[in-house]
């Protein structure tokens, strides 16, 4: 293993839950204002995940006061305090860019049902 791979392996985070495009996430972001630090929650739908390793990013979209807002986060960033999966979405695409043109209930993503094991 060369030096860069070893450095990348040290920077990877293991506390990030598994999530896919279509899932609704609560991303707790560390915000530093002057000398104070606080956590800010950004909740929205994952519209894409791209890259791999340390360079992996994901984009979350939400509608705030009628305006669509998208934020792209590095998965392994130290500025992310934690990531929670609010709901699992049932989608058939890896990139959900089509949500940008949809309004209201049309932009709603079906929730994935968890199948109970047969007993």
From Swiss-Prot:
It comes from Saccharopolyspora erythraea (strain ATCC 11635 / DSM 40517 / JCM 4748 / NBRC 13426 / NCIMB 8594 / NRRL 2338). This is Large ribosomal subunit protein bL19. Belongs to the bacterial ribosomal protein bL19 family. GO terms for biological process: translation. The keyword ATP-binding does not apply. The gene is rplS. GO terms for molecular function: structural constituent of ribosome. Transmembrane segments: none annotated. Keywords: Ribonucleoprotein, Ribosomal protein. PROSITE patterns: RIBOSOMAL_L19. Pfam families: Ribosomal_L19. GO terms for cellular component: cytosolic large ribosomal subunit. This protein is located at the 30S-50S ribosomal subunit interface and may play a role in the structure and function of the aminoacyl-tRNA binding site. Gene3D superfamilies: 2.30.30.790. NCBIfam families: rplS_bact. It comes from the Bacteria.
């Amino acid at each position: 293993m060369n030096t860069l791979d070893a450095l990348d392996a040290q920077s990877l985070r293991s506390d990030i839950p598994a999530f896919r495009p279509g899932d609704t996430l609560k991303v707790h972001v560390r915000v530093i204002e002057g000398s104070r630090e606080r956590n800010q929650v950004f909740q929205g739908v994952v519209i894409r995940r791209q890259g791999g390793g340390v360079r992996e990013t994901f984009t979350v979209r939400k509608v705030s006061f009628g305006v669509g807002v998208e934020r792209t986060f590095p998965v392994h960033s130290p500025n992310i305090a934690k990531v929670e999966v609010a709901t699992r979405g049932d989608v058939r695409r890896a990139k959900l860019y089509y949500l940008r043109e949809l309004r209201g209930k049309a932009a709603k993503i079906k929730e994935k049902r968890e199948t109970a094991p047969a007993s």
